[in-house]
Amino acid sequence: MSILLFGVSHRSAPVSVLEQLSIDESEQVKIVDRVLQSPLVTEAMVLSTCNRVEVYAVVEAFHGGLSAIGQVLSDHSGMSMGELTKHAYVRYSEAAVEHLFAVASGLDSAVVGEQQVLGQVRRSYSAAEANRTVGRVLHELAQRTLSVGKRVHSETSIDAAGASVVSVALGIAERKLGGLGAKTAVVIGAGSMGALSSAHLTRAGIGKVHVLNRSLARAQRLAGKIRQSGVLAEARTLDRLAEVLTDADAVVSCTGAVAPVVSLADVHHALATARRDETTRPLVICDLGMPRDVDPAVAGLPGVWLIDVERVQREPSAHAASADVAAARHIVAAEVAGYLAGQRMAEVTPTVTALRQRAADVVEAELLRLDNRLPGLDSAERDEVARTVRRVVDKLLHAPTVRIKQLASAPGGDSYAEALRELFQLDQTAVDAVATAGELPVFSSGLDAGSGPQGADGPSAGPTPSAPNPSAE
């Protein structure tokens, strides 16, 4: 078994494709359950954000697992496999681990170094764990990933500027409006992104905030927090959107809705009612939703500036300092090496355990033979003989078993477990029983980024009629 990643992100696809693939929280369980219907997939979890849709899975065979995941995403998005392949990237084994570590560290984000993605990884893992779709392999990977993300943010200055998609978008809005002080803003969505937007607006000196949400209670809670910061805030339901837009200078929307919540008619009506245009009072709309919350046609209205995720990516403040990025990548590389060393060591552990069990069985058999040959041996003498024999066996096995774990943990050490089984004629069934009993996880590794496995399942991750083409991101 090994880890397979199938993904599409802002680096490989335009927003229109990400919109089609977007998976909201209510759909994630269904997507994972469909992926797990394949007998070749044993564990799976989905990471779906404004910038990416990625499926991480533990698979028995590369091409079969890849085909199963690709087909589920193709059916979900309505895209043909060929269309999906154009924008997809695939990572396998070591490369999948490295990619997830980099994602959690903010290295693959639209705004490099942002911390929100670490929370998104945590929520994706928690959801998969609650649904029992992650086992030992993805559990350990997710736990290590969260640790790596925290380490990068604590040991580097990659997030020193506190940049995020929200902060960069509002920074653009602030420039367009000549500052946000005493301005009126509309925040659509009262979730985590809405709260983050409100915090940035408050720090920027915004004069008033309208919070809109489907649930009025959630909008009221967020509005209450804003008022505690000394800023005027009102809560509204979404059907009041056209009304509040007439007085808005800036709008931030990130709802996760499957269709636009801000229509061309809404914005046109607001501008016409207030007799606003580009010169009298411009309107800046930050659409941070995925799928998009704002009808793209809004950008064609005079006096409206539409800022989306693609625009945010082009902003200089979305890119961290090269030295900080290099430091973060160094940590990720070291963590990947450490993780894989631990997994390789874990792979040989069941064999070592089986060897020690074989030795214990031999000792017990010989002690029984001794009892039959020397029935007059008293219990004290027998106990001393038993302790002596066990000490001899333990001392003989200690150094080689410790050393073989060290050798197996190094790159290219995959063959040591097999050599040990061959030398001591250990039954593979016994070794498998130890591994299945939960001693330590077994992990198969050994692929470079963007390449497929060598062996029975196929020579490479090249394109096939039923599987997407693994490509460099």
Swiss-Prot record:
CDD domains: NAD_bind_Glutamyl_tRNA_reduct. It is an enzyme of class 1 (oxidoreductase). Its EC number is 1.2.1.70. This is Glutamyl-tRNA reductase. Possesses an unusual extended V-shaped dimeric structure with each monomer consisting of three distinct domains arranged along a curved 'spinal' alpha-helix. The N-terminal catalytic domain specifically recognizes the glutamate moiety of the substrate. The second domain is the NADPH-binding domain, and the third C-terminal domain is responsible for dimerization. The record marks 99 as: Important for activity. Homodimer. Pfam families: GlutR_dimer (PF00745), GlutR_N (PF05201), Shikimate_DH (PF01488). InterPro entries: 4pyrrol_synth_GluRdtase (IPR000343), 4pyrrol_synth_GluRdtase_dimer (IPR015896), 4pyrrol_synth_GluRdtase_N (IPR015895), GluRdtase_CS (IPR018214), GluRdtase_dimer_dom_sf (IPR036453), GluRdtase_N_sf (IPR036343), NAD(P)-bd_dom_sf (IPR036291), Shikm_DH/Glu-tRNA_Rdtase (IPR006151).
